Amino acid sequence: MTDSQITAQILTESLKYFLKYRDQTVVIKYGGNVMIDEKVKESILKDILLLKTVGIKVVLVHGGGPAIGELLEKYEQKSQFVKGLRVTNKKTAQLALTALAGKVNKSLVQDIIRLGGNAIGVSGIDGKLIEAKPISEDLGYVGEITAIHPEIIERINQTDAVPVIASAAIGLDGEIYNVNADTAASRIAGSLCAEQFILLSDVRGLYGNFPDEGSFIDEINLTNLEKLVKEKKITDGMIPKIEAIKYAMQEGLGQAVLLDGRVPHALLLELFTDRGQGTLINH
């Protein structure tokens, strides 16, 4: 077959997936080390634009990547951590918001427009999208999410724009709170009853015995996932992601995928091919 015929065959095979996801909501969490490489970022954003073009309601939720740490260092704010959570005073919370909603969010919106799409950037503060309360006095302005109000996302989804959400939160006291971006994204996915929640990271997915490639898990249900957690076969860094996914699936999320965002066009390979690319988690 010629290259053109191969391309046509691939598109034909993808048709059933285009139809499956058309008019469905797919929430994508983008953050961490995946944000560092500009080529990786462009590949992810191009995939997102294609998803939008074929009629999928794509919602992009992001963390701060290295931007928060860089801004805190610039203003000589030392980071302290308690049980993996950054201790956040009021100034740190304001700087984190600047990095998230200012630098990172608007950069993503700009890049999507540059690539030929459209995007509207908001933070969890806008429209009280993400509400939170303080976890403890020791952590300062670190929040536990108490409610999601997705109306602003639903309105954006009625347009040709991709909603790009910075994972900051607002309290009933009017204060800004730092919340876990994975948790924020999963809660948004649950509130929208999304068909799919894709959590991009810098690992392939779940393993029964990490990093043994022979133990890679293509698909798993919640019951067997619980067994892996109890058997301590899930690495510590994955536990918060798993807990976030479990909560969202209880709230109405259809499926979740842990996916290596560094793989070129990983989103397309996951959604539009039979084999997929990462670990699919279902009910």
Curated annotation (Swiss-Prot):
Pfam families: AA_kinase (PF00696)
Catalyzed reactions: N-acetyl-L-glutamate + ATP = N-acetyl-L-glutamyl 5-phosphate + ADP
Keyword Kinase (UniProt): yes
This protein's pathway: Amino-acid biosynthesis; L-arginine biosynthesis; N(2)-acetyl-L-ornithine from L-glutamate: step 2/4
The entry's keywords: Amino-acid biosynthesis, Arginine biosynthesis, ATP-binding, Cytoplasm, Kinase, Nucleotide-binding, Transferase
EC number(s) reported in the record: 2.7.2.8
Domain of life of the native organism: Bacteria
Top-level EC class: transferase
InterPro entries: AceGlu_kinase-like_sf (IPR036393), AcgluKinase_fam (IPR004662), ArgB (IPR037528), Asp/Glu/Uridylate_kinase (IPR001048), Glu/AcGlu_kinase (IPR001057), NAGK-C (IPR041727)
Molecular functions per Gene Ontology: acetylglutamate kinase activity; ATP binding
Gene Ontology annotations of biological process type: arginine biosynthetic process via ornithine; L-arginine biosynthetic process
Subcellular location(s) of the protein: Cytoplasm
One GO term describing the cellular component: cytoplasm
Keyword Nucleotide-binding: yes
Residues marked Transition state stabilizer (site): 29, 241
Annotated positions binding substrate: 64-65, 86, 178
Entry similarity comment: Belongs to the acetylglutamate kinase family. ArgB subfamily.
Function: Catalyzes the ATP-dependent phosphorylation of N-acetyl-L-glutamate.
Name of this chain's protein: Acetylglutamate kinase
Lineage: Bacteria, Bacillati, Bacillota, Bacilli, Lactobacillales
